[in-house]
Amino acid sequence: MHRLDRDTGGLILFARYGETAARFQKNLDRILLRKFYLAVVRGKFPEGEVECHMPLREDPEDPIRLRMHHRVDGKECFTRFKLVRHLDCPEIAPELSLVEAELITGRKHQIRAHLAEMGYPIVGDRLYYRDGEFYQKLAQGGELTDEDIKVLGAHNQMLFAYKVELQLPYWKEPRTFESHAYPADMAKLLAE
């Protein structure tokens, strides 16, 4: 009923029957009230809440066409970020932060692009970290080496859709669902 970026893990809504999905799809904004993600980012994210209003769009001049960029003529995007805690893992980066992101709008690569543009790229993000160097290597038929994975900090990007708030027509109150079944690299880091 909704989507996640290709390399993003976490909660996703499915309907058992096509007819149910079609009916709910029309009213998704009234059913799926809030979506929250956890991201491990490079850098010391500021305390408190950070609101990011940054329009995004693809750049036809970018050799990686699918990457989103901050452009004044882009689609309006709004993400609310909040520091959960700073992390200590010098083998990945001198400073890391666990950040909660709430999508207010839902655009392609919104969280990844916003964090990268703000100077806090997501650990393991092949597309937005180091100007897409690792994404390009894979796109050209190459494979990532152990050294590449070490530089990225993880085998997978550390972005996880961990919580949704839903309101179905037959419920009196909205309900919240959470998952903490993180990918192995992320689970190991968060357990430390």
Tell me the role of every PLM-derived stretch.
Residues 1-192:
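RNA pseudouridine synthases
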